[in-house]
Structure formats: structure tokens, C-alpha cells
Amino acid sequence: MYTTPELQEFGGANAYLRSCASRSVLDLLSNKWVCLVVGALASGPMRFGALRRRLDGITQKMLTRTLRDLERSGLVAREVFPTTPPQVEYSLTPLGGNLAVLMGEIRVWSEEHMGEITDARSHYDARAEEPVRPL
């Protein structure tokens, strides 16, 4: 699949190289909503409305896009139940469950260190001529 010698040297994947396909995976995983959706589904299957209520601030459009991206990547399974109206439930696949462990650790780390990050940003902004806008 890869012809770049550097990729072959690392067994076909090296995210530090522009030509490595794993960068698209990192792009997906760096989205805050992906982290939060995976975390919410780690506790078990959920319907769209329950997910939306759990994820304060997410729009319907963003939740739909995030779920589609996760389903496309094999991290989330979508099951439609034959009811009237149809009910749809989302759950993590085994691959998504594996990711949930890592995402959970990142979420916990961010919660534990948010005070330090906020302080560092305040100190930086105080030294800068113009405050840096939040990400």
C-alpha cells in the first residue's frame, strides 16, 4: 500500500510523515465531539436524543456528522429497530470500546489539569501584547 521507504521502515505507518494515512485517523480523533461521543457511549448504547441531552452544547447537525464519521470509521454501530416510529440506537464497536479507554484518560487528564492550563493561558496572555483568542 505504501511505497515511501520511511513508511515501510515503520511497518506501514508513521503519522509524522505527510503521506501516512494514519493522519486522517488523528484528524478524526482530535475532534472534541468525537472524544465526548465516544465517552458517552462507553457506558452503553444510547439513542440520538439521549446523546444530545448528555452532550451539552452539541447541535443536532454536529452530532449527526460526528456519529456518521464514527460509524464510517468502524467505531460506532447504528442499529435501527422496526418500531413505529423507527428507533435508532448507537453503540461502540469493539474497536470503539478500545478507543473509549484512551479517550476516557484524555478527558480525565483535561478535567484534572484544566486549572493549570487556564492559569498558564492567563500568564501568557498577560505577557503578550494582544491576548490570544481561545481555540
Segments predicted by a language model, with ranges:
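C-terminal regulatory/oligomerization modules of transcriptional regulators
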Residues: 1-17, 72, 77, 94-135
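N-terminal helix-turn-helix DNA-binding core of bacterial DNA-binding proteins
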Residues: 12-62
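Short amphipathic alpha-helical segments with heptad-repeat character
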Residues: 38, 42, 89, 97-100, ...
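Residues within the helices of the helix-turn-helix
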Residues: 49, 68, 88
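Alpha-helical initiation/capping and key positions within long helical/coiled-coil segments
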Residues: 50, 62, 91-94, 98
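Basic amphipathic alpha-helical segments that dock to polyanions
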Residues: 63, 67-70
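Beta-hairpin "wing" of winged helix-turn-helix
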Residues: 71-91
